[in-house]
């Protein structure tokens, strides 16, 4: 099975940087991700339209490019968790995780017996037709796959110390917008309430060797989160990178300076 370089880096105390794929579902984009020097990407299966076929196509290119493919699933159901791994993802990001019981369920669905209850269905996308035997393949899959839980609600903030202490959790990823909404301060990332919750998550992670993480839409905010201790770092989306690049191109060429912009700033994680 493909080695998970970002898992090894995080376990050694390092930091990793990636982005989110939402709309540009041509796997050629993985080549650009690699060329840019990013460590990983995650396909958004919660909010966007990506299918398991898209996941598998991206995984094929990622494996040959040395980029780590992750997927955010819609919810913590066995079907989504296990089948996404069977399609070759090296890690799962689970949204809106809120309790110890849910974390235990996620780990159980993602790990083979005796650690969990994942069914054996390792396909060529995982083994590359180089079968080493069931025991060896299951051991490798358990070792290389990543469990990443999202902190996006007040209940998660309240239970975060117990949640990240569940054996098998590798990293967290704060969803800033959902978290700020749950905290009663929608989109207000200057509010100390937000950073108090964020720092609580970082402290909880550091106590048990889990990598604290976040997905922000700008490098400015991501650097701020990094200063607060985040190490699993995600910035922007495919569409935000395209828009920012095109906007910079138009601004630098300055051939239509008398014409007003046709669109405002993109929102959310854009």
Give residue ranges: language-model regions.
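Alpha-helix-loop-beta-strand connector modules within alpha/beta enzyme cores
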Residues: 52-86, 108-115, 139-142, 190-213, ...
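Conserved beta-strand positions in the central sheet of alpha/beta enzyme cores
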Residues: 18, 41-42, 93, 173, ...
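Conserved N-terminal beta1-alpha1 strand-loop-helix module at the mouth
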Residues: 1-69, 75-76, 108, 147, ...
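Extended, intrinsically disordered, low-complexity segments
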Residues: 237-241, 245-270
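N-terminal amphipathic alpha-helix/helix-capping segment at the start of soluble metabolic enzymes
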Residues: 1-20, 129-143, 199-200, 206-207, ...
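Glycine-rich phosphate-binding active-site loops on the catalytic face of alpha/beta enzymes
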Residues: 91-105, 172-181, 230-249
């Amino acid at each position: 099975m493909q080695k998970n370089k970002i898992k090894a880096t995080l376990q050694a105390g390092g930091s990793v940087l990636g982005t989110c794929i939402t709309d540009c579902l041509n796997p050629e984009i993985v080549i650009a991700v690699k060329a840019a020097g990013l460590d990983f990407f995650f396909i958004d299966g919660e909010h966007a339209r990506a299918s398991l076929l898209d996941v598998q196509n991206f995984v094929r290119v990622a494996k040959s490019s040395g980029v780590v493919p992750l997927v955010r699933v819609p919810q913590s159901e066995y079907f989504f968790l296990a089948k996404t791994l069977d399609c070759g993802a090296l890690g799962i990001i689970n949204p809106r995780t809120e309790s110890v019981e849910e974390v235990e369920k996620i780990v159980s669905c993602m790990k083979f017996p005796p650690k969990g209850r994942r069914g054996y269905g390792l396909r060529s996308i995982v083994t590359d037709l180089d079968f080493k035997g069931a025991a060896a393949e299951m051991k490798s899959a358990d070792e290389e796959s990543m469990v990443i839980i999202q902190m996006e609600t007040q209940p998660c903030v309240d239970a975060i110390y117990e949640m990240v202490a569940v054996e098998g959790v590798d990293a967290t990823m704060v969803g800033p917008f959902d978290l700020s909404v749950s905290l009663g301060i929608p989109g207000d990332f200057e509010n100390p309430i937000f950073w108090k919750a964020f720092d609580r998550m970082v402290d909880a992670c550091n106590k048990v060797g889990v990598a604290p993480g976040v997905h922000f839409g700008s490098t400015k905010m991501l650097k701020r989160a990094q200063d607060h201790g985040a190490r699993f770092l995600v910035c922007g989306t495919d569409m935000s990178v395209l828009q920012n690049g095109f906007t910079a191109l138009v601004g630098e060429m300055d051939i239509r300076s008398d014409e007003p912009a046709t669109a405002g700033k993109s929102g959310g994680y854009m």
